[in-house]
């Protein structure tokens, strides 16, 4: 049985919903399962925020030299370290973007949403052709979440966004390379890449909410970049999504790396 059959077997017995895309950027081959299924984005919504951050720096809408002050008004719990710092610390857009991705810092994310503009971020999302992705609330906004206001995306949209990171005419190559370097510094590596040797380059981002476990990124074997997107939704008290990510990662390592 080939890789596709092995992965489909895992998905078939998963106790929930899976959205998956594996796309060979050179050979053009792809595997898609429920790629149009709209799911809570969790921290994957930070990927289009990262894109818009670099886009606004590239076209001069914001300055690379600008320093943004930490304030208690944007304090956010969950993942990240900025919530533990005293107000008055100043950080650059690059500092905030790096923290938002590498340790999934929610406070850094909210500061970027404020500084870049939620409408601008959603305009960028539409401009990139991500028709099923939308930023509707900041991180850790539980009041909005209880009212059903959620950031959403699909595996197909995330795969398309990651393809823009690799090849795009809308952002300079240097900016795209910088974003990929930030993704490659990811500190949350308990899913797709959990059992891979450290030498394997994987520029990626995870996402988690109760019952939601995602891992998506750009894998760099010796010959070609691969886009890998795995989104899962299951019981809020289950870790089945993390297990599926690890199992798919093990198959990818055995069959492709």
Regions found by a protein language model. Give the residues of each.
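Active-site SXXK
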Residues: 28, 40-68, 100, 228
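A short glycine/serine-rich beta->alpha loop
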Residues: 32-39, 86, 147-148
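Short glycine/serine- and small hydrophobic-enriched flexible loop segments
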Residues: 51-59, 114, 160-167, 253-254
């Amino acid at each position: 049985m080939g890789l596709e059959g092995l992965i489909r077997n895992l998905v078939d017995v998963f106790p929930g919903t899976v959205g998956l895309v594996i796309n060979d950027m050179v050979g053009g081959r792809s595997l898609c399962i429920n790629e149009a299924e709209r799911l809570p984005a969790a921290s994957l919504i930070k990927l289009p925020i990262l894109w818009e951050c670099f886009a606004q720096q590239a076209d001069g809408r914001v300055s690379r030299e600008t320093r943004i002050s930490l304030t208690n008004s944007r304090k956010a719990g969950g993942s990240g370290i900025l919530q533990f710092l005293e107000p008055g610390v100043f950080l650059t857009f690059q500092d905030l973007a790096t923290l938002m991705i590498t340790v999934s810092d929610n406070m850094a994310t909210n500061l970027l949403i404020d500084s870049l503009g939620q409408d601008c971020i959603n305009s960028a999302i539409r401009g990139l052709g991500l028709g099923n992705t939308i930023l509707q609330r900041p991180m850790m906004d539980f009041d909005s979440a209880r009212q059903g206001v959620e950031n959403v995306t699909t595996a197909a949209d995330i795969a398309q966004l990651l393809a823009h990171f690799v090849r795009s005419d809308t952002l300079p190559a240097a900016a795209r390379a910088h974003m990929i370097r930030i993704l490659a510094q990811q500190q949350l590596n308990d899913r797709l890449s959990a059992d891979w040797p450290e030498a394997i380059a994987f520029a990626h981002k995870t996402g988690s909410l109760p019952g939601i476990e995602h891992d998506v990124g750009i894998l760099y074997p010796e010959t070609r970049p691969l886009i890998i997107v795995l989104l899962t939704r299951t019981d809020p008290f289950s870790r089945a999504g993390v297990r599926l990510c690890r199992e798919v990662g093990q198959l990818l390592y055995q069959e492709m790396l």
